[in-house]
Protein backbone atom coordinates (compact mmCIF):
# COMPACT_ATOMS: atom_id res chain seq x y z
CA UNK A 1 0.00 0.00 0.00
CA UNK A 2 2.92 2.32 0.67
CA UNK A 3 4.04 2.29 -2.97
CA UNK A 4 0.49 3.12 -4.11
CA UNK A 5 0.34 6.18 -1.85
CA UNK A 6 3.79 7.19 -3.11
CA UNK A 7 2.67 6.89 -6.74
CA UNK A 8 -0.42 8.99 -6.04
CA UNK A 9 1.61 11.78 -4.50
CA UNK A 10 4.07 11.72 -7.41
CA UNK A 11 1.43 11.88 -10.14
CA UNK A 12 -0.87 14.45 -8.58
CA UNK A 13 1.26 17.60 -9.09
CA UNK A 14 1.57 16.87 -12.81
CA UNK A 15 -1.92 16.01 -14.04
CA UNK A 16 -4.90 13.76 -13.62
CA UNK A 17 -5.30 12.70 -17.24
CA UNK A 18 -7.08 9.39 -16.71
CA UNK A 19 -7.52 7.08 -19.69
CA UNK A 20 -7.07 9.69 -22.40
CA UNK A 21 -3.57 10.52 -21.15
CA UNK A 22 -2.54 6.89 -21.37
CA UNK A 23 -3.64 6.72 -24.99
CA UNK A 24 -2.12 10.00 -26.14
CA UNK A 25 0.81 10.83 -23.90
CA UNK A 26 3.35 10.35 -26.68
CA UNK A 27 1.47 12.53 -29.22
CA UNK A 28 3.86 14.68 -31.20
CA UNK A 29 2.85 18.36 -31.45
CA UNK A 30 3.60 18.97 -35.08
CA UNK A 31 1.76 19.08 -38.40
CA UNK A 32 2.81 15.52 -39.23
CA UNK A 33 2.99 12.43 -37.07
CA UNK A 34 6.60 11.34 -37.66
CA UNK A 35 9.48 11.79 -35.26
CA UNK A 36 10.74 10.30 -32.05
CA UNK A 37 9.00 10.46 -28.68
CA UNK A 38 10.80 12.65 -26.11
CA UNK A 39 11.99 11.22 -22.78
CA UNK A 40 9.38 13.04 -20.69
CA UNK A 41 6.55 11.60 -22.79
CA UNK A 42 8.04 8.13 -22.47
CA UNK A 43 8.28 8.61 -18.70
CA UNK A 44 4.64 9.61 -18.50
CA UNK A 45 3.53 6.65 -20.57
CA UNK A 46 5.42 4.10 -18.56
CA UNK A 47 4.69 5.75 -15.22
CA UNK A 48 0.99 5.02 -15.67
CA UNK A 49 1.49 1.39 -16.68
CA UNK A 50 4.45 0.61 -14.42
CA UNK A 51 3.98 -2.24 -12.04
CA UNK A 52 7.18 -1.59 -10.15
CA UNK A 53 7.52 1.20 -7.59
CA UNK A 54 11.28 1.14 -8.08
CA UNK A 55 11.03 1.65 -11.85
CA UNK A 56 8.41 4.37 -11.36
CA UNK A 57 10.63 6.24 -8.92
CA UNK A 58 13.58 6.02 -11.27
CA UNK A 59 11.64 7.44 -14.20
CA UNK A 60 10.19 10.21 -12.07
CA UNK A 61 13.64 11.22 -10.86
CA UNK A 62 14.86 11.19 -14.44
CA UNK A 63 12.10 13.57 -15.47
CA UNK A 64 13.07 16.07 -12.78
CA UNK A 65 16.38 16.58 -14.56
CA UNK A 66 15.15 16.39 -18.15
CA UNK A 67 15.07 19.30 -20.57
CA UNK A 68 11.33 19.85 -20.23
CA UNK A 69 9.67 21.18 -17.11
CA UNK A 70 6.48 19.77 -15.68
CA UNK A 71 4.72 22.91 -16.91
CA UNK A 72 5.84 22.17 -20.48
CA UNK A 73 4.54 18.65 -20.19
CA UNK A 74 1.22 19.77 -18.81
CA UNK A 75 0.86 22.30 -21.64
CA UNK A 76 1.35 19.57 -24.23
CA UNK A 77 -1.07 17.24 -22.52
CA UNK A 78 -3.70 19.95 -22.35
CA UNK A 79 -3.27 20.60 -26.07
CA UNK A 80 -3.93 16.93 -26.80
CA UNK A 81 -7.17 17.18 -24.85
CA UNK A 82 -8.23 20.15 -26.99
CA UNK A 83 -7.75 18.17 -30.18
CA UNK A 84 -10.18 15.57 -28.82
CA UNK A 85 -8.60 12.30 -30.03
CA UNK A 86 -11.74 10.28 -29.27
CA UNK A 87 -14.18 11.79 -31.81
CA UNK A 88 -14.06 12.09 -35.60
CA UNK A 89 -15.27 15.70 -35.50
CA UNK A 90 -14.43 18.65 -33.27
CA UNK A 91 -16.95 21.09 -31.84
CA UNK A 92 -16.01 24.68 -31.13
CA UNK A 93 -17.37 24.37 -27.60
CA UNK A 94 -14.79 21.70 -26.78
CA UNK A 95 -11.89 24.10 -27.36
CA UNK A 96 -10.18 26.69 -25.21
CA UNK A 97 -8.75 29.85 -26.75
CA UNK A 98 -5.39 29.44 -28.52
CA UNK A 99 -2.40 30.49 -26.44
CA UNK A 100 -0.76 33.06 -28.72
CA UNK A 101 2.38 34.90 -27.67
CA UNK A 102 1.55 38.32 -26.17
CA UNK A 103 4.68 39.27 -24.22
CA UNK A 104 6.11 42.33 -26.09
CA UNK A 105 9.69 41.51 -25.11
CA UNK A 106 9.40 37.93 -26.36
CA UNK A 107 7.64 39.07 -29.53
CA UNK A 108 10.49 41.47 -30.27
CA UNK A 109 12.96 38.61 -29.80
CA UNK A 110 11.00 36.38 -32.20
CA UNK A 111 10.85 39.18 -34.78
CA UNK A 112 14.64 39.54 -34.60
CA UNK A 113 15.02 35.79 -35.10
CA UNK A 114 12.75 35.98 -38.15
CA UNK A 115 14.81 38.81 -39.61
CA UNK A 116 17.93 36.69 -39.19
CA UNK A 117 16.34 33.93 -41.27
CA UNK A 118 16.14 36.46 -44.11
CA UNK A 119 19.72 37.66 -43.63
CA UNK A 120 18.63 40.71 -41.65
CA UNK A 121 18.45 42.65 -44.93
CA UNK A 122 15.94 45.55 -44.97
CA UNK A 123 14.59 44.60 -48.39
CA UNK A 124 13.44 41.27 -46.95
CA UNK A 125 11.04 42.67 -44.36
CA UNK A 126 8.98 45.76 -43.57
CA UNK A 127 7.18 47.33 -40.65
CA UNK A 128 6.44 50.61 -42.43
CA UNK A 129 2.90 51.82 -41.73
CA UNK A 130 2.00 52.02 -45.41
CA UNK A 131 3.04 48.40 -45.94
CA UNK A 132 1.25 47.21 -42.82
CA UNK A 133 -1.92 48.97 -43.99
CA UNK A 134 -1.67 47.54 -47.51
CA UNK A 135 -1.28 44.03 -46.10
CA UNK A 136 -4.37 44.37 -43.91
CA UNK A 137 -7.07 45.90 -46.09
CA UNK A 138 -8.06 47.28 -49.48
CA UNK A 139 -10.68 49.88 -50.29
CA UNK A 140 -12.59 47.30 -52.34
CA UNK A 141 -12.62 44.75 -49.50
CA UNK A 142 -16.03 43.88 -48.12
CA UNK A 143 -14.89 43.49 -44.51
CA UNK A 144 -12.47 45.97 -42.98
CA UNK A 145 -10.21 45.56 -39.92
CA UNK A 146 -9.96 47.92 -36.99
CA UNK A 147 -6.99 50.36 -37.01
CA UNK A 148 -5.19 48.14 -34.48
CA UNK A 149 -5.50 45.00 -36.59
CA UNK A 150 -2.19 45.19 -38.40
CA UNK A 151 0.64 42.66 -38.70
CA UNK A 152 3.68 43.07 -36.45
CA UNK A 153 5.96 42.74 -39.47
CA UNK A 154 5.84 41.64 -43.12
CA UNK A 155 8.41 39.10 -44.30
CA UNK A 156 9.49 38.63 -47.93
CA UNK A 157 11.13 35.19 -48.24
CA UNK A 158 13.11 34.05 -51.28
CA UNK A 159 12.79 30.26 -51.03
CA UNK A 160 10.62 27.44 -49.73
CA UNK A 161 13.34 26.68 -47.18
CA UNK A 162 13.11 30.22 -45.78
CA UNK A 163 9.34 29.89 -45.50
CA UNK A 164 9.90 26.63 -43.62
CA UNK A 165 12.26 28.29 -41.14
CA UNK A 166 9.83 31.18 -40.64
CA UNK A 167 6.92 28.88 -39.87
CA UNK A 168 8.99 26.72 -37.53
CA UNK A 169 9.93 29.78 -35.47
CA UNK A 170 6.33 31.03 -35.43
CA UNK A 171 5.07 27.56 -34.51
CA UNK A 172 7.57 27.18 -31.67
CA UNK A 173 6.59 30.59 -30.30
CA UNK A 174 2.81 30.50 -30.90
CA UNK A 175 2.85 33.45 -33.30
CA UNK A 176 -0.10 33.79 -35.75
CA UNK A 177 0.83 33.82 -39.45
CA UNK A 178 -1.13 35.28 -42.38
CA UNK A 179 0.00 34.22 -45.89
CA UNK A 180 -0.22 36.96 -48.53
CA UNK A 181 0.19 37.07 -52.30
CA UNK A 182 -1.86 39.41 -54.53
CA UNK A 183 -4.19 40.81 -51.88
CA UNK A 184 -7.20 40.87 -54.22
CA UNK A 185 -9.56 38.74 -52.12
CA UNK A 186 -12.85 40.27 -51.00
CA UNK A 187 -14.05 38.57 -47.80
CA UNK A 188 -11.31 39.67 -45.40
CA UNK A 189 -9.05 36.68 -46.11
CA UNK A 190 -5.75 38.36 -45.22
CA UNK A 191 -7.11 40.54 -42.44
CA UNK A 192 -4.91 40.05 -39.31
CA UNK A 193 -7.55 39.37 -36.67
CA UNK A 194 -5.04 39.07 -33.81
CA UNK A 195 -3.58 42.35 -32.57
CA UNK A 196 0.13 42.88 -32.02
CA UNK A 197 1.60 39.46 -32.71
CA UNK A 198 0.69 38.49 -36.30
CA UNK A 199 3.41 37.79 -38.86
CA UNK A 200 2.50 38.30 -42.53
CA UNK A 201 4.45 36.24 -45.08
CA UNK A 202 4.33 37.84 -48.54
CA UNK A 203 5.57 35.72 -51.46
CA UNK A 204 4.91 38.31 -54.17
CA UNK A 205 8.18 40.24 -53.95
CA UNK A 206 10.74 37.50 -54.58
CA UNK A 207 8.93 34.19 -55.11
CA UNK A 208 7.33 35.10 -58.44
CA UNK A 209 9.21 33.04 -61.02
CA UNK A 210 8.63 30.26 -63.50
CA UNK A 211 10.48 27.20 -62.16
CA UNK A 212 10.02 24.69 -64.98
CA UNK A 213 8.02 24.55 -68.21
CA UNK A 214 7.10 21.18 -69.76
CA UNK A 215 5.58 22.04 -73.11
CA UNK A 216 5.23 18.42 -74.22
CA UNK A 217 3.28 17.57 -71.08
CA UNK A 218 1.32 20.84 -71.15
CA UNK A 219 2.21 21.83 -67.59
CA UNK A 220 4.28 24.49 -65.88
CA UNK A 221 5.73 24.81 -62.37
CA UNK A 222 5.68 28.30 -60.89
CA UNK A 223 6.23 30.02 -57.56
CA UNK A 224 3.18 31.15 -55.62
CA UNK A 225 3.86 34.87 -55.98
CA UNK A 226 3.60 34.86 -59.78
CA UNK A 227 0.65 36.94 -61.08
CA UNK A 228 -1.66 34.90 -63.27
CA UNK A 229 -1.50 37.56 -66.02
CA UNK A 230 2.30 37.17 -66.16
CA UNK A 231 1.87 33.41 -66.41
CA UNK A 232 -0.56 33.87 -69.28
CA UNK A 233 1.84 36.23 -71.06
CA UNK A 234 4.61 33.63 -70.74
CA UNK A 235 2.40 30.83 -72.07
CA UNK A 236 0.95 32.93 -74.87
CA UNK A 237 4.32 32.93 -76.66
CA UNK A 238 3.95 29.14 -76.89
CA UNK A 239 0.34 29.15 -78.10
CA UNK A 240 -0.89 28.16 -74.65
CA UNK A 241 -2.91 29.69 -71.83
CA UNK A 242 -3.69 29.29 -68.12
CA UNK A 243 -7.26 28.10 -67.59
CA UNK A 244 -8.29 30.41 -64.73
CA UNK A 245 -8.71 34.18 -65.12
CA UNK A 246 -9.68 35.79 -61.80
CA UNK A 247 -9.52 39.51 -61.07
CA UNK A 248 -6.51 41.58 -62.15
CA UNK A 249 -3.59 41.35 -59.72
CA UNK A 250 -4.38 37.89 -58.37
CA UNK A 251 -1.37 35.61 -57.92
CA UNK A 252 -1.05 31.85 -58.09
CA UNK A 253 -0.81 31.35 -54.32
CA UNK A 254 -4.00 33.29 -53.73
CA UNK A 255 -5.70 31.53 -56.65
CA UNK A 256 -4.97 28.20 -54.95
CA UNK A 257 -5.88 29.37 -51.45
CA UNK A 258 -9.21 30.72 -52.66
CA UNK A 259 -9.99 28.10 -55.31
CA UNK A 260 -10.40 30.86 -57.90
CA UNK A 261 -12.07 30.54 -61.26
CA UNK A 262 -13.11 33.53 -63.38
CA UNK A 263 -14.74 33.93 -66.77
CA UNK A 264 -12.97 30.94 -68.37
CA UNK A 265 -14.04 28.42 -65.72
CA UNK A 266 -17.07 27.40 -67.79
CA UNK A 267 -14.68 25.89 -70.37
CA UNK A 268 -11.45 25.17 -68.50
CA UNK A 269 -12.54 24.53 -64.92
CA UNK A 270 -11.71 26.19 -61.61
CA UNK A 271 -8.35 26.18 -59.86
CA UNK A 272 -8.87 22.76 -58.33
CA UNK A 273 -9.27 21.28 -61.83
CA UNK A 274 -6.09 23.00 -63.03
CA UNK A 275 -3.69 21.92 -60.26
CA UNK A 276 -1.33 18.98 -60.80
CA UNK A 277 0.77 19.28 -57.65
CA UNK A 278 1.82 21.75 -54.97
CA UNK A 279 4.71 22.33 -52.60
CA UNK A 280 3.34 23.32 -49.21
CA UNK A 281 4.98 24.37 -45.96
CA UNK A 282 2.93 23.12 -43.02
CA UNK A 283 2.50 25.14 -39.81
CA UNK A 284 5.44 23.48 -38.05
CA UNK A 285 7.79 24.04 -41.01
CA UNK A 286 7.43 20.59 -42.59
CA UNK A 287 7.72 20.77 -46.40
CA UNK A 288 5.27 18.58 -48.35
CA UNK A 289 4.89 17.98 -52.08
CA UNK A 290 1.41 16.67 -52.78
CA UNK A 291 2.37 14.35 -55.68
CA UNK A 292 4.51 14.09 -58.81
CA UNK A 293 3.28 15.17 -62.29
CA UNK A 294 0.69 12.64 -63.46
CA UNK A 295 -2.56 13.92 -64.95
CA UNK A 296 -4.39 11.27 -62.94
CA UNK A 297 -3.59 9.28 -59.83
CA UNK A 298 -5.47 7.08 -57.39
CA UNK A 299 -2.54 6.85 -54.98
CA UNK A 300 -3.48 7.92 -51.49
CA UNK A 301 -5.49 10.86 -50.24
CA UNK A 302 -6.17 13.79 -52.57
CA UNK A 303 -3.93 16.34 -50.85
CA UNK A 304 -4.46 18.82 -53.69
CA UNK A 305 -8.16 18.86 -52.89
CA UNK A 306 -7.44 19.42 -49.22
CA UNK A 307 -5.28 22.50 -49.70
CA UNK A 308 -7.00 24.17 -52.67
CA UNK A 309 -9.56 26.50 -51.11
CA UNK A 310 -8.11 26.27 -47.59
CA UNK A 311 -7.48 30.06 -47.55
CA UNK A 312 -4.06 29.79 -45.91
CA UNK A 313 -5.43 28.06 -42.82
CA UNK A 314 -3.45 24.82 -43.26
CA UNK A 315 -0.08 26.04 -44.54
CA UNK A 316 1.65 28.16 -47.17
CA UNK A 317 1.79 27.08 -50.82
CA UNK A 318 5.19 28.05 -52.24
CA UNK A 319 5.15 26.31 -55.64
CA UNK A 320 2.57 24.71 -57.90
CA UNK A 321 2.49 22.76 -61.13
CA UNK A 322 -0.55 23.78 -63.16
CA UNK A 323 -2.09 22.66 -66.42
CA UNK A 324 -1.57 24.57 -69.65
CA UNK A 325 -4.32 24.71 -72.27
CA UNK A 326 -3.94 25.10 -76.02
CA UNK A 327 -5.35 28.44 -77.11
CA UNK A 328 -8.25 28.25 -79.57
CA UNK A 329 -7.11 28.45 -83.17
CA UNK A 330 -10.06 30.73 -83.88
CA UNK A 331 -12.18 32.70 -81.42
CA UNK A 332 -14.70 35.52 -81.42
CA UNK A 333 -16.73 37.45 -78.88
CA UNK A 334 -20.49 37.94 -79.15
CA UNK A 335 -22.44 40.59 -77.22
CA UNK A 336 -26.20 40.06 -76.91
CA UNK A 337 -28.69 42.35 -75.13
CA UNK A 338 -32.11 41.51 -73.66
CA UNK A 339 -35.01 43.49 -72.24
CA UNK A 340 -34.97 41.67 -68.90
CA UNK A 341 -32.36 39.94 -66.77
CA UNK A 342 -34.65 36.93 -66.54
CA UNK A 343 -34.53 36.49 -70.34
CA UNK A 344 -30.74 36.86 -70.36
CA UNK A 345 -30.31 34.31 -67.58
CA UNK A 346 -32.74 31.91 -69.26
CA UNK A 347 -30.67 32.15 -72.45
CA UNK A 348 -27.57 31.14 -70.47
CA UNK A 349 -29.36 28.16 -68.91
CA UNK A 350 -30.70 27.01 -72.29
CA UNK A 351 -27.24 27.19 -73.88
CA UNK A 352 -25.73 25.12 -71.07
CA UNK A 353 -28.48 22.52 -71.31
CA UNK A 354 -28.17 22.34 -75.11
CA UNK A 355 -24.57 21.10 -74.97
CA UNK A 356 -23.18 23.96 -77.09
CA UNK A 357 -19.53 24.27 -76.04
CA UNK A 358 -18.53 27.88 -75.37
CA UNK A 359 -15.33 29.24 -73.84
CA UNK A 360 -17.08 31.78 -71.61
CA UNK A 361 -20.62 32.96 -70.89
CA UNK A 362 -21.00 36.17 -68.87
CA UNK A 363 -24.02 38.24 -67.84
CA UNK A 364 -24.01 41.97 -66.96
CA UNK A 365 -27.23 43.68 -65.90
CA UNK A 366 -28.40 47.08 -67.18
CA UNK A 367 -27.00 48.90 -64.14
CA UNK A 368 -23.55 47.52 -64.84
CA UNK A 369 -23.73 48.58 -68.48
CA UNK A 370 -24.72 52.10 -67.38
CA UNK A 371 -21.80 52.25 -64.94
CA UNK A 372 -19.34 51.10 -67.61
CA UNK A 373 -20.51 53.91 -69.86
CA UNK A 374 -20.41 56.47 -67.03
CA UNK A 375 -16.96 55.46 -65.81
CA UNK A 376 -15.44 55.70 -69.30
CA UNK A 377 -13.40 52.62 -68.45
CA UNK A 378 -13.46 51.29 -72.02
CA UNK A 379 -12.64 52.79 -75.39
CA UNK A 380 -16.32 52.97 -76.27
CA UNK A 381 -19.00 54.55 -74.07
CA UNK A 382 -22.11 53.72 -76.06
CA UNK A 383 -22.91 50.26 -74.74
CA UNK A 384 -26.60 49.31 -74.88
CA UNK A 385 -27.81 49.83 -71.32
CA UNK A 386 -29.78 46.62 -70.99
CA UNK A 387 -29.04 43.19 -69.50
CA UNK A 388 -26.27 41.88 -71.72
CA UNK A 389 -24.66 38.50 -72.35
CA UNK A 390 -20.98 38.27 -73.36
CA UNK A 391 -19.87 35.05 -75.07
CA UNK A 392 -16.43 33.74 -76.00
CA UNK A 393 -16.90 31.34 -78.89
CA UNK A 394 -13.86 29.34 -80.01
CA UNK A 395 -12.85 26.35 -82.11
CA UNK A 396 -10.21 24.84 -84.38
CA UNK A 397 -11.27 26.84 -87.45
CA UNK A 398 -13.28 29.92 -88.44
CA UNK A 399 -15.93 27.67 -89.97
CA UNK A 400 -16.48 25.88 -86.66
CA UNK A 401 -16.67 29.22 -84.85
CA UNK A 402 -19.16 30.64 -87.36
CA UNK A 403 -21.38 27.58 -86.96
CA UNK A 404 -21.31 28.01 -83.17
CA UNK A 405 -22.17 31.71 -83.53
CA UNK A 406 -25.28 30.75 -85.52
CA UNK A 407 -26.32 28.25 -82.83
CA UNK A 408 -25.85 30.81 -80.05
CA UNK A 409 -27.82 33.39 -82.02
CA UNK A 410 -30.72 30.96 -82.49
CA UNK A 411 -30.96 30.24 -78.75
CA UNK A 412 -30.67 33.96 -77.94
CA UNK A 413 -33.53 34.77 -80.30
CA UNK A 414 -35.71 32.12 -78.66
CA UNK A 415 -35.15 34.05 -75.41
CA UNK A 416 -36.19 37.40 -76.93
CA UNK A 417 -32.81 39.09 -77.48
CA UNK A 418 -33.01 42.50 -79.12
CA UNK A 419 -29.45 42.87 -80.41
CA UNK A 420 -26.67 40.46 -81.39
CA UNK A 421 -23.17 41.68 -82.22
CA UNK A 422 -20.04 39.59 -82.72
CA UNK A 423 -16.44 40.57 -83.37
CA UNK A 424 -15.15 40.52 -86.93
CA UNK A 425 -11.45 40.69 -85.98
CA UNK A 426 -9.08 40.49 -82.99
CA UNK A 427 -9.22 44.22 -82.24
CA UNK A 428 -13.00 44.17 -82.07
CA UNK A 429 -12.86 41.01 -79.95
CA UNK A 430 -10.68 42.76 -77.37
CA UNK A 431 -12.92 45.82 -77.44
CA UNK A 432 -16.08 43.83 -76.84
CA UNK A 433 -14.61 41.72 -74.02
CA UNK A 434 -13.05 44.77 -72.34
CA UNK A 435 -16.41 45.77 -70.87
CA UNK A 436 -16.61 42.50 -68.96
CA UNK A 437 -13.11 42.75 -67.50
CA UNK A 438 -13.56 46.28 -66.11
CA UNK A 439 -16.93 45.62 -64.46
CA UNK A 440 -15.86 45.82 -60.79
CA UNK A 441 -13.61 48.81 -61.34
CA UNK A 442 -16.39 50.61 -63.18
CA UNK A 443 -18.63 50.39 -60.11
CA UNK A 444 -15.86 51.70 -57.88
CA UNK A 445 -14.72 54.48 -60.19
CA UNK A 446 -18.16 55.72 -61.17
CA UNK A 447 -19.26 56.34 -57.60
CA UNK A 448 -15.99 57.28 -55.93
CA UNK A 449 -15.56 60.10 -58.42
CA UNK A 450 -18.63 61.69 -56.83
CA UNK A 451 -18.20 60.64 -53.21
CA UNK A 452 -14.85 59.53 -51.75
CA UNK A 453 -16.58 58.04 -48.71
CA UNK A 454 -18.40 55.47 -50.84
CA UNK A 455 -17.62 51.82 -50.15
CA UNK A 456 -18.63 48.74 -52.06
CA UNK A 457 -19.96 45.43 -50.82
CA UNK A 458 -18.99 42.74 -53.31
CA UNK A 459 -20.30 39.23 -52.84
CA UNK A 460 -21.17 36.12 -54.81
CA UNK A 461 -23.30 32.98 -54.71
CA UNK A 462 -23.72 30.02 -57.06
CA UNK A 463 -26.78 27.90 -57.80
CA UNK A 464 -27.67 24.96 -60.06
CA UNK A 465 -27.95 26.19 -63.64
CA UNK A 466 -31.68 25.40 -63.77
CA UNK A 467 -32.23 27.82 -60.86
CA UNK A 468 -30.02 30.62 -62.19
CA UNK A 469 -32.66 32.77 -63.89
CA UNK A 470 -35.09 32.55 -60.96
CA UNK A 471 -32.55 33.39 -58.23
CA UNK A 472 -30.87 36.20 -60.16
CA UNK A 473 -34.25 37.74 -61.06
CA UNK A 474 -35.42 37.74 -57.42
CA UNK A 475 -32.09 39.17 -56.24
CA UNK A 476 -32.29 41.91 -58.85
CA UNK A 477 -35.78 42.95 -57.70
CA UNK A 478 -34.66 43.00 -54.07
CA UNK A 479 -31.64 45.20 -54.76
CA UNK A 480 -33.57 47.62 -56.94
CA UNK A 481 -36.10 48.14 -54.14
CA UNK A 482 -33.29 49.18 -51.76
CA UNK A 483 -32.55 52.36 -53.80
CA UNK A 484 -28.80 51.78 -53.32
CA UNK A 485 -26.46 51.85 -56.30
CA UNK A 486 -26.07 48.22 -57.34
CA UNK A 487 -25.14 45.95 -60.20
CA UNK A 488 -25.03 42.25 -61.01
CA UNK A 489 -22.41 40.30 -62.94
CA UNK A 490 -22.74 36.57 -63.52
CA UNK A 491 -20.61 33.67 -64.70
CA UNK A 492 -23.79 32.40 -66.24
CA UNK A 493 -22.43 29.12 -67.55
CA UNK A 494 -21.90 27.67 -64.09
CA UNK A 495 -24.68 29.45 -62.18
CA UNK A 496 -22.36 31.85 -60.33
CA UNK A 497 -23.19 35.55 -59.99
CA UNK A 498 -21.84 38.58 -58.14
CA UNK A 499 -23.63 41.53 -56.58
CA UNK A 500 -22.00 44.94 -56.20
CA UNK A 501 -23.72 47.30 -53.75
CA UNK A 502 -22.47 50.80 -52.89
CA UNK A 503 -22.99 52.26 -49.41
CA UNK A 504 -21.79 55.27 -47.39
CA UNK A 505 -23.49 55.43 -44.00
CA UNK A 506 -23.89 52.85 -41.20
CA UNK A 507 -27.58 52.68 -42.08
CA UNK A 508 -26.78 51.87 -45.70
CA UNK A 509 -24.25 49.28 -44.53
CA UNK A 510 -27.00 47.58 -42.56
CA UNK A 511 -29.23 47.63 -45.64
CA UNK A 512 -26.39 46.00 -47.60
CA UNK A 513 -26.02 43.35 -44.95
CA UNK A 514 -29.70 42.48 -45.14
CA UNK A 515 -29.63 42.35 -48.96
CA UNK A 516 -26.66 39.99 -48.91
CA UNK A 517 -28.27 37.85 -46.23
CA UNK A 518 -31.40 37.40 -48.35
CA UNK A 519 -29.32 36.77 -51.47
CA UNK A 520 -27.32 34.00 -49.78
CA UNK A 521 -30.38 32.36 -48.26
CA UNK A 522 -32.10 32.51 -51.63
CA UNK A 523 -29.15 30.62 -53.13
CA UNK A 524 -29.08 28.06 -50.32
CA UNK A 525 -32.81 27.43 -50.69
CA UNK A 526 -32.12 26.70 -54.37
CA UNK A 527 -29.52 24.07 -53.32
CA UNK A 528 -26.66 26.41 -54.13
CA UNK A 529 -23.69 27.73 -52.19
CA UNK A 530 -22.93 30.89 -50.23
CA UNK A 531 -19.87 31.51 -52.41
CA UNK A 532 -18.92 30.26 -55.86
CA UNK A 533 -15.41 31.71 -56.01
CA UNK A 534 -14.86 34.55 -53.51
CA UNK A 535 -14.33 32.17 -50.60
CA UNK A 536 -15.50 32.32 -47.00
CA UNK A 537 -12.83 34.40 -45.23
CA UNK A 538 -14.33 36.33 -42.33
CA UNK A 539 -17.51 37.41 -44.07
CA UNK A 540 -19.33 34.15 -44.75
CA UNK A 541 -18.48 31.89 -41.83
CA UNK A 542 -22.05 31.85 -40.53
CA UNK A 543 -23.35 30.93 -43.98
CA UNK A 544 -20.90 28.05 -44.31
CA UNK A 545 -22.44 26.58 -41.19
CA UNK A 546 -25.94 27.16 -42.55
CA UNK A 547 -25.02 25.64 -45.92
CA UNK A 548 -23.27 22.49 -44.71
CA UNK A 549 -24.53 21.94 -41.18
CA UNK A 550 -22.58 21.35 -37.97
CA UNK A 551 -21.01 17.96 -38.68
CA UNK A 552 -19.11 18.92 -41.89
CA UNK A 553 -17.81 22.14 -40.30
CA UNK A 554 -16.80 20.22 -37.17
CA UNK A 555 -14.94 17.80 -39.46
CA UNK A 556 -13.11 20.72 -41.08
CA UNK A 557 -12.21 21.99 -37.62
CA UNK A 558 -10.84 18.55 -36.73
CA UNK A 559 -8.66 18.54 -39.86
CA UNK A 560 -7.49 22.08 -39.12
CA UNK A 561 -6.33 21.21 -35.60
CA UNK A 562 -4.75 17.94 -36.72
CA UNK A 563 -2.50 19.89 -39.10
CA UNK A 564 -2.30 23.14 -37.12
CA UNK A 565 -2.84 22.24 -33.43
CA UNK A 566 -1.58 25.64 -32.26
CA UNK A 567 -3.99 27.41 -34.63
CA UNK A 568 -1.35 29.82 -35.92
CA UNK A 569 -2.27 29.74 -39.63
CA UNK A 570 -4.55 32.60 -40.73
CA UNK A 571 -6.63 32.57 -37.53
CA UNK A 572 -10.41 32.96 -37.55
CA UNK A 573 -10.92 32.34 -41.28
CA UNK A 574 -13.51 29.94 -42.83
CA UNK A 575 -14.83 28.80 -39.43
CA UNK A 576 -14.18 29.64 -35.80
CA UNK A 577 -11.43 27.89 -33.86
CA UNK A 578 -11.58 30.16 -30.81
CA UNK A 579 -14.77 30.04 -28.72
CA UNK A 580 -13.75 33.37 -27.15
CA UNK A 581 -12.84 35.10 -30.40
CA UNK A 582 -12.53 38.90 -29.95
CA UNK A 583 -15.64 40.73 -31.15
CA UNK A 584 -15.34 42.81 -34.32
CA UNK A 585 -17.92 43.74 -36.93
CA UNK A 586 -15.25 44.25 -39.65
CA UNK A 587 -16.90 47.26 -41.23
Swiss-Prot record:
Domain FAD-binding PCMH-type: 146-327
Entry keywords, A to Z: FAD, Flavoprotein, Membrane, Mitochondrion, Mitochondrion inner membrane, Oxidoreductase, Transit peptide
A cellular component term, taken from the record's GO annotations: mitochondrial inner membrane
Main location class: mitochondrion
Induction cue: By D-lactate. Induced during respiratory adaptation.
Gene Ontology MF terms: D-lactate dehydrogenase (cytochrome) activity; D-lactate dehydrogenase activity; FAD binding; flavin adenine dinucleotide binding
Cofactor(s) required, per the database record: FAD
EC number: 1.1.2.4
Catalytic activities: (R)-lactate + 2 Fe(III)-[cytochrome c] = 2 Fe(II)-[cytochrome c] + pyruvate + 2 H(+)
GO biological process, one term: lactate catabolic process
Entry's cofactor comment: Binds 2 FAD.
Record SUPFAM superfamilies: FAD-binding/transporter-associated domain-like (SSF56176), FAD-linked oxidases, C-terminal domain (SSF55103)
Superkingdom in the source lineage: Eukaryota
Uppermost EC category: oxidoreductase
Keyword Flavoprotein: yes
Stated family: Belongs to the FAD-binding oxidoreductase/transferase type 4 family.
Miscellaneous comment: Present with 10800 molecules/cell in log phase SD medium.
Function: Catalyzes the stereospecific oxidation of D-lactate to pyruvate.
Protein name: D-lactate dehydrogenase [cytochrome] 1, mitochondrial
Classification of source organism: Eukaryota, Fungi, Dikarya, Ascomycota, Saccharomycotina
Amino acid sequence: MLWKRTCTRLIKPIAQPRGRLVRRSCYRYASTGTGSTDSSSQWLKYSVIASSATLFGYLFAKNLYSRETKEDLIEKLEMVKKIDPVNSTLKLSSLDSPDYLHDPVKIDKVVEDLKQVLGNKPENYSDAKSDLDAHSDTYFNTHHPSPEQRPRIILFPHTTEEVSKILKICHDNNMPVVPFSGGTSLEGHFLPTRIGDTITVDLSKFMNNVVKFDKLDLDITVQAGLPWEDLNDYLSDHGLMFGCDPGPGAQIGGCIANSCSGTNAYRYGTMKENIINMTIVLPDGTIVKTKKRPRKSSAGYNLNGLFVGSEGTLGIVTEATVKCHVKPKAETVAVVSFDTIKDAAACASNLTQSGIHLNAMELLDENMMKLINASESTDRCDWVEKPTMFFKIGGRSPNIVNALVDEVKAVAQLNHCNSFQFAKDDDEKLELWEARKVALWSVLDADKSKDKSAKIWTTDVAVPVSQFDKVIHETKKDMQASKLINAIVGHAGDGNFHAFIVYRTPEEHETCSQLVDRMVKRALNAEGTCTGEHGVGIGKREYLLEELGEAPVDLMRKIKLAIDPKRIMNPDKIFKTDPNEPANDYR
